[in-house]
Amino acid sequence: MEPILINAQVQMWSAKAGMSKSRNALIETCVGKREVKLILYFSTGKIKTLQLHDNIKSVVLQTYGEDQNYLHLTFKNNDFLFVEKLTTTDARRLKRFLDKTSQGSIRPARSDERCGEPSTSAQELNGSGSSCETNSECFESPKESEMCMFRELSLLPSSSTFLHNVGLLENQFIKRKRFFSDLAKNEKQSNLKDSIRDFEANLVVCISNEKGKERNVREVDISKPGFGFPFETNYPEDSGVDVRDLNDLITKLFSPVLLETHCIENGLEWHEYMKTYLLYPEKLWQGLPNVGNTCYINVVLQSLCSIPLFINDLFNQGFPWIKAPKDDFNMLLMQLLVLKDIYNARFRQKLLIGITKALPIFGEIFAVDRQNDAHEFLSLCLVQLKETFQRVTMMWQSENDSGDFYLLKDIFADYATINKMPVCPVTNNFEFELLSSIFCKACGLTLFKGEPSRYLSINIPQGGKDMSIQSTLDLFFSAEELEHRCEKCLYNKSVSFHRFGRLPRVIIVHLKRYHFNESWVMKKDERPILVSKYLRLSCHCSKSTKPPPPLRPGEHVKNLDLLKPLEVLGSEILKLPFNSVRTSRSKGFETINITSNRESEAQSGKRVSEVLSGKVQQENSGKGDTAHIVGSELTKETEKLKKHEEEHRPSDLDSGSIREAQKYQQAEKCNEGRSDKQISLEALTQSRPKPISQEQTENLGKTTLSHTQDSSQSSQSSSDSSKSSRCSDDLDKKAKPTRKVDPTKLNKKEDNVYRLVNIINHIGNSPNGGHYINDAFDFKRQSWFTYSDLHVTRTQEDFVYRGRSSTGYVFFYMHNDIFEELLAKETQSTSTSKG
């Protein structure tokens, strides 16, 4: 039978070596006297041989474009070969040959005498005399002797043996060169001779010495074979993700869960693991390993993962496996954010190492093995994610049929989520507009400036007592006198204040816990700041302030329907029982169609695959929108603040909470010389509050209002002018309590209230050392958890508010209406699945 010669991209997976890198190869079919084989000739000179007779489990051929096909060949030991970029003619020829071999229509001439059992493992070509004698039965003819794979070894042979074996190899390849010369007429094989020359220039000869040990004559290439985890940047030629290579893309994202069963926690297979992940989320309390001073990275990732709307916005729009970033940092970052609960600790460690290696490109401040600031890393992540989203989305929308995303766009053409108007996850959840106004005290000329922001950085007032997050925020928005020369009257004193032009879903408050002493040495500010459960922003908004984007249908869940095309890309991969011992445990969950069986009963329709188009409102507020408001806002500011404070007068809880927080501070204080490990353990084992009564437990879902402002602090924003003096007088008056309001009750009619969902804490008394941990509210389990690298512990909600007064550094507050709606949807989803 005439051999078939095909040029294509090939990729192999085996249980021992994992997934190889996708490489260009010449594929030859060979029917010998004893075996039917596929021979793969790589451009590097390597040769691999794959035995086919009585060794084929399945053959799948798929078409994904005009004259573009891929073939998935699975062997009986569950190794597989993935061949892509096949023309229609070549694909049909190869498929026909493999089908006939599988059905027994094509058999070796003497199949009963073939040596060895069917296997996909590659054989080596031994050139020494003793080796040839040993393997003479296998290599009877020059043609069969060429069916081998060269393995790279570390030792060198003697010169005499080297010459003997090189001569042997030259004789063996004479016929092959003659055979290849007949292919010159085929334009698709124009580079064949170059490949042969490359092969002969990089021969690897394996010999046996007197002790039977194999030695290497010359390595094929310097680099290691293309096996291992695909996320590691082992290949300099890979400047980014080539999304046209579908299997490579799957490998880059899902190989740890699709292909390597030992990467799954508790030995579960992919289907079982996804079933557990969907139905029993309480089993997935996963932390992140510390790979060397990376606690600041871990707390930021855990904090972002605690905002389900943000993660779902990434996932449901196909980031990163459909719309893949082109750089390592954003690719790895998105993988950890979206698939953190699927990857096990070992693989999360590899991703974190990749992130740390990619960080130095953003500046020396993020050098490897260096302690860094969590807030700076959070800011970097938000900026990079937004820029990457905009860049990839623009490429997705603008590329034509020849672009990198053409194939993926065709596959996901029926998925409305992917093709709807894009919504940036950062803009949609964290970004807000801050309107700054500068009012001239002489002529009244007002300047307006609106700028988007993703967080508020707030100073801790000097000399303040019984301060809270709410009071420091109010002070930030209070009127402030500054020196600013008026363009109209040239007067150099003005009053400035801020207002929200657009509110976010989640507002991030960064508390500046550092100050400079007399020697200009930066010190950590450990003064207790009471953690407010609720933030009230109504007094800092105007009538034109835009509300945060509302929840869209299905936004509260990950749209797992987007995983269905993986079946099209490699359905056989998902069905393979890679470990026969575990096969029995995967019954009833054979494919990645998550919406089958039990989930269909669990109201699978709630996983809506179509997300309504709702482009984030752009900041188009101009002078016409704010000019008529700011003038009156300046004169009414103090009256509004006074009225607001009188309605929400703090009770005796404030002073008591501060005293109690000071006790917690003594328990969690750390010496600067202690190690991160000691600090981490102390942070998790420090004393918890005593059990609280049922009545108090019910009140935890309501407000613990903390709303104070000292007269000396408010007077800092005043001046000798009459206007600012009146502001100070009014601000002083609000510090005098007039009536008590139950801090555990929230006014249902109150607008623009935000609720705490996450805190990043810094443990230690120096800004240049210590350890980061974070407390996060889990919507699925409806409980608070403390994350310290890999350690995850459940904590009491009351402790979060009272015990983090001196360690709280970055605070995440979610709009209360969105919080309640999201919580209700999660509760309904949980009860439905249990029912």
From Swiss-Prot:
Physiological role: Deubiquitinase regulating several biological processes through the deubiquitination of components of these processes. Involved in somatic cell reprogramming through the 'Lys-48'-linked deubiquitination and stabilization of CBX4 and CBX6, two components of the polycomb-repressive complex 1 (PRC1). Also deubiquitinates and probably stabilizes the androgen receptor (AR), regulating the androgen receptor signaling pathway. May play a role in spermatogenesis.
Biased composition annotated in UniProt, kind: Basic and acidic residues: 634-652, 669-679, 726-747
SUPFAM superfamilies registered for this protein in UniProt: Cysteine proteinases (SSF54001)
Active site, renumbered: C295 (nucleophile), H771 (proton acceptor)
Region Disordered, residue ranges: 102-128, 597-747
Protein name in the entry: Ubiquitin carboxyl-terminal hydrolase 26
UniProt subcellular location: Nucleus; Cytoplasm, Cytoskeleton, Flagellum axoneme
Domain of life: Eukaryota
Reaction equation(s) it catalyzes: Thiol-dependent hydrolysis of ester, thioester, amide, peptide and isopeptide bonds formed by the C-terminal Gly of ubiquitin (a 76-residue protein attached to proteins as an intracellular targeting signal)
Naturally occurring in which organism (per UniProt): Mus musculus (Mouse)
GO terms for cellular component: cytoplasm; cytoskeleton; motile cilium; nucleus
A biological process from GO: regulation of androgen receptor signaling pathway
UniProt keyword DNA-binding, yes or no: no
GO molecular function terms listed in the Swiss-Prot or TrEMBL record: cysteine-type deubiquitinase activity; K48-linked deubiquitinase activity
Stored InterPro entries: Papain-like_cys_pep_sf, Peptidase_C19, Peptidase_C19_UCH, USP37-like_PH, USP37-like_PH_sf, USP_CS, USP_dom
Enzyme Commission (EC) number: 3.4.19.12
